[in-house]
Structure formats: structure tokens, C-alpha cells
């Protein structure tokens, strides 16, 4: 699961306060609430938490008066079925994002026309963002999340009200995630690869810019400089792909087997050790993981 979960650091949506432990239902509920605001389909959404946060949340249910919830929470730290989630799990293989040396609010965007057209980014869903005014040689890490002043999140489903084609915006700022490690030059300038792209109109609008253009917007990051932030994530099953393919069967080897079940293909090959007179079995799989739709998930911290 480590390879699959490592993709969760590329979710740009983040709720809660960076570094805070999840210890209350309200702290956890911010995640399914955000998924609903992002129009993520219900039914196949799951939450995965670090043991520290999972046990913290389990403690929130020990005082309930429903025996089927309180007893497992006390005896096995088992999480009940949670509204908005098909299931909630704990894993010690979630990624840990170590923030860059950038400070919380330091840099500015540098360029008046830094928006994207859907047709140009539809296969990558990313863009470059030219920035300046950072500290010299400041670093930015893949998984760093930030907002731009005056750039708000939008309801991805609703269209305009008849007087405008713009989607209605929420009261909170749109978040963006850094996709690649970068370092500012000696003058504090850097070009960041980010997702989602800034699409400010049309059916695939990702944000609403209340500013005249995209120049000089304050960049505010989630988490302090060099902060260590374990990732909790809630997401739809279609957000991340796990792909395998059947391996070729070796020629001249008997008793080989290959089986594909629910899209996962495994090959078994007998290996005879003639020196030690031992029969061994080799199991092989080839696979890859990939974030395929960052719109279908969110990271979360405690309140």
C-alpha cells in the first residue's frame, strides 16, 4: 500500500490545521464535507489515517452511548462506519511531507496572464506558475500546498445564474499543490509546477480570481517552513490508479501458473535448486501507481 498511498501527497485540497492530531468527530468531518463541496461521488470514498490520528479519532467514540460503537472503539480502537465514507482505515505507510524552507507567506506571483485553457492542460492538469519575492535559495517540496490571495474555490458542478457563465465560488481560497521539488534563485525567483491549473471560466473552471489579473498575488503555504506533516487522506477509489499487466510465461518451464483477479495479475514459477535439492517457488508481479484525478480527494489534519 505504500506506493498507492504515496500519491495522496498530490491532493491539493487540505483541511484542518497542519500538524494537529485528529481527536474529534468535527476534526474528521471536515474531510467528507470538503469532498462533498468538491462534488466527489459518494459511495466509494475512503479515509486512511496514520495510527496517531486513527487512535485519536477512535477515542472520540469511547464516550458514546451506542454499544456497537463504543465497545469496539475501546477494545480494539476500531473506527465505526462514518458518514460520507464507505470505510476508514489506519496505515503506517502514509507519506510524510517535509515542507520546503519557504515561509508561510512570503512570495508573490509574477505575471498578469498566468491562467490556463482546459484544452491545453486536459491531459496533465497542471501548469507552471512564475513567482518571485521569495528568500534567496528558498526550497519548495513536492506536496507543498498553498493559496493565492483573492483566488477562491468554486462549486465544480453548478454553472452561472443566467447573468454570468462563472461558477459560484466558495468563501475559502482555492488550494494548489507543488508537483516537483524546486529551489528559488539568488533573487528569490522560481517557477513552480502546480496543480490544479488556474482555469477561471468555462465548464472546467477550477477557481474564481477576484483580482484584476494574476500578478502580485500573495502566496501562502500550509505548514511552517521545514515542517514535518504526516498525510491523512480521504478520497474516491477512482482518484488513484493501481495497474498491473500479465507477465509472459517462461518457455521450457513446467507447472507455471498465472492468475488475474480483480485486475491484479500474479505469476508463479517453480525454481529447483539442484545443489541443495530444494524446491522453491517464485512469485512475480509488475505494477504501477498513478494519481489520475486529484479532484477526487483531500488531505486532512485535526481541527
Predicted regions and their residues:
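Core alpha/beta structural scaffold of self-assembling particle/tube/pore-forming proteins
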Residues: 1-303
Amino acid at each position: 500500500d505504500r506506493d498507492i498511498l504515496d500519491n495522496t501527497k498530490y491532493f491539493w485540497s487540505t483541511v484542518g490545521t497542519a500538524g494537529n492530531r485528529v481527536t474529534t468527530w468535527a476534526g474528521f468531518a471536515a474531510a467528507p464535507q470538503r469532498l462533498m463541496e468538491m462534488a466527489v461521488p459518494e459511495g466509494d470514498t475512503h479515509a486512511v489515517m496514520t495510527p496517531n490520528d486513527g487512535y485519536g479519532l477512535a477515542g472520540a467514540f469511547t464516550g458514546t452511548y451506542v454499544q456497537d460503537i463504543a465497545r469496539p472503539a475501546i477494545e480494539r480502537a476500531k473506527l465505526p462506519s462514518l458518514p460520507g465514507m464507505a470505510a476508514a482505515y489506519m496505515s503506517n505507510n502514509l507519506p510524510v511531507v517535509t515542507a520546503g524552507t519557504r515561509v508561510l507567506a512570503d512570495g508573490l506571483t509574477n505575471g498578469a496572464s498566468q491562467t490556463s485553457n482546459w484544452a491545453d492542460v486536459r491531459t496533465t492538469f497542471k501548469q507552471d506558475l512564475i513567482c518571485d519575492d521569495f528568500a534567496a535559495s528558498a526550497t519548495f517540496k513536492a506536496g507543498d500546498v498553498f493559496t493565492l490571495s483573492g483566488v477562491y474555490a468554486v462549486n465544480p458542478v453548478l454553472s452561472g445564474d443566467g447573468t454570468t457563465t462563472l461558477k459560484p465560488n466558495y468563501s475559502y481560497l482555492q488550494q494548489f499543490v507543488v508537483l516537483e521539488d524546486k529551489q528559488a534563485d539568488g533573487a528569490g525567483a522560481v517557477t513552480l509546477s502546480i496543480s490544479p491549473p488556474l482555469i477561471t471560466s468555462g465548464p472546467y473552471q477550477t477557481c474564481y480570481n477576484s483580482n484584476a489579473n494574476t500578478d502580485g498575488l500573495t502566496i501562502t503555504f500550509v505548514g511552517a517552513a521545514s515542517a514535518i506533516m504526516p498525510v491523512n487522506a480521504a478520497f474516491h477509489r477512482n482518484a488513484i490508479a493501481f495497474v498491473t499487466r500479465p507477465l509472459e510465461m517462461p518457455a521450457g518451464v513446467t507447472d507455471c501458473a498465472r492468475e488475474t483477479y480483480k485486475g491484479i495479475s500474479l505469476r508463479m514459477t517453480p525454481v529447483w535448486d539442484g545443489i541443495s535439492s530444494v524446491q522453491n517457488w517464485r512469485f512475480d508481479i509488475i505494477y504501477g501507481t498513478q494519481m489520475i484525478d486529484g479532484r477526487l480527494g483531500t488531505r486532512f489534519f485535526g481541527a
